[in-house]
Amino acid sequence: MSDHLIPSIPTPAAAPAAAPAVDDNQLIAERREKLKLMRAAQAEGKGVAFPNDFKPGHRAAALIEAHGAADAEALEAQAVAVSVAGRMMLKRVMGKASFATVQDATSRIQLYVTRDAIGEEAYAEFKRWDLGDIVGAEGTLMKTKTGELSVKVTKLRLLTKSLRPLPDKFHGMADQEQKYRQRYVDLITDETARVRFTARSKAVSALREFMVGHGFLEVETPMLHPIPGGANAKPFKTHHNALDQEMFLRIAPELYLKRLIVGGFERVFEINRSYRNEGISVRHNPEFTMMEFYAAYWNYRDLMDFTETLIRTIADKAVGTQQLTYQGKPVDLTQPFERLTIREAILKYTEAGTGVDDSAWLINALRKIGLSEEKDKLSQRSLASLQVMYFEETVEEKLWQPTFIMEHPTEISPLARANDERPEVTERFELYITGREFGNGFSELNDAEDQAARFNAQVAAKDSGDDEAMFYDHDFVRALEYGMPPTGGCGIGIDRLMMLLTDSPSIRDVILFPALRRES
């Protein structure tokens, strides 16, 4: 068995031709009738419709690993007693002997059920059970004539009656939105989904272990904020009845984490949800998981070094290699991550030439792309801001290999420290892989008076109609007035990192229950 957290995700076998459609409503009615009979039997003191006293002593994967290679004679001689439980996924009834396959959280294992072993009445009951029912079985291990490890059942119980039929075993859930909406069915029927989300959990655990191993303290900060802050984004609003005040779901934990740096914790991190009331796409979900971390006495170059090591380490622990494949194209984490300023990236990946330093040229180029004066206020923007817009429209998607993009304009980076030599830009970077932003970090602004002035500029922008501009956070400024050491901070999108590690095309594929329009 592989030591890596994310095993190779199996490729589903080609499906045979579809079987004739069966009316689900009819099947549900038949199953409800069976449950009705079970309840009636319970009322007469004959069993329990939903028993909860069966305790499986073994998992399918562990049994297969321990005994899968044993030969039939050895297993028979050992008479290994086992008890398993799971969902019945396959069933073949053949007179006095039948086979069923049950699936637990780890794998599947076959049951060999005979009338002689469990009794005529129990065998008759078993034949009435349906796929999807959850069963418990006791018996001994055996090998079939084809060499498949199986449980020769001596006791068999129905633990939960399934009222809804599972999708066709070969075709599964064909509708992608239905997979997202009914993730519980997707997990039952699609092994790749179970592998993917198990991998996500283990990779996040490895990430947490990495941070703690580097001296970071894990903390929890509020999800409900009296003032939204920490990022330029549109927040979700709610109302706190007891306090009788408007509150906001957090768009980022940044300002609270930096308060902790002021308080004397020199290295902190948080892995948690953030919320942004914005668009939904293959890269964006309004509720998403992010890790933010802050280290006193670090600057943005220290952060880039650390982030590079972090990404490589998690890839090693998760998939056992730093040479990945994403949607058929290689992603090489073994090479040093390229570091370019926004201007350098434009010159490298476009034919802008001297136009990169010409506001009029950039405005004209952006208009040709489809941006407008009315919506985007191009003529009101600085050269640095126009360069960012041109970068986002023409360069971003070309950054397939890991690349740090540096020196974002001060006007759009209200929490970042300005560059001492070029105060119009900041000591900030964004990490791009596969044409997508994976992280954002910078040397933190720790000048309280400068921060107050930046907040005032954000308030003016909000008054001019910028919904994503920040509010003025008086308490955060007050915290900075006590003095915050030089600090570096970074946020990494966990969902996008999981997309990369599991080769998933959409962010919805790595979020168990993504945001969807209400079902009609």
UniProtKB/Swiss-Prot annotation:
Supply the PROSITE patterns for this chain: AA_TRNA_LIGASE_II
Gene Ontology terms, MF aspect: ATP binding; lysine-tRNA ligase activity; magnesium ion binding; tRNA binding
Cofactors (names): Mg(2+)
What keywords appear on the UniProt entry?
A: Aminoacyl-tRNA synthetase, ATP-binding, Cytoplasm, Ligase, Magnesium, Metal-binding, Nucleotide-binding, Protein biosynthesis
Top-rank lineage group of the source organism: Bacteria
Pfam families registered for this protein in UniProt: tRNA-synt_2, tRNA_anti-codon
- InterPro entries documented for this protein: Aa-tRNA-synt_II (IPR004364), aa-tRNA-synth_II (IPR006195), aa-tRNA-synth_II/BPL/LPL (IPR045864), Lys-tRNA-ligase_II (IPR002313), Lys-tRNA-ligase_II_N (IPR044136), Lys-tRNA-synth_II_C (IPR018149), NA-bd_OB-fold (IPR012340), NA-bd_OB_tRNA (IPR004365)
Which NCBIfam families does this entry report, sorted A to Z?
lysS_bact, PRK00484.1
Protein name as it appears in the record: Lysine--tRNA ligase
Q: Which gene encodes it?
A: lysS
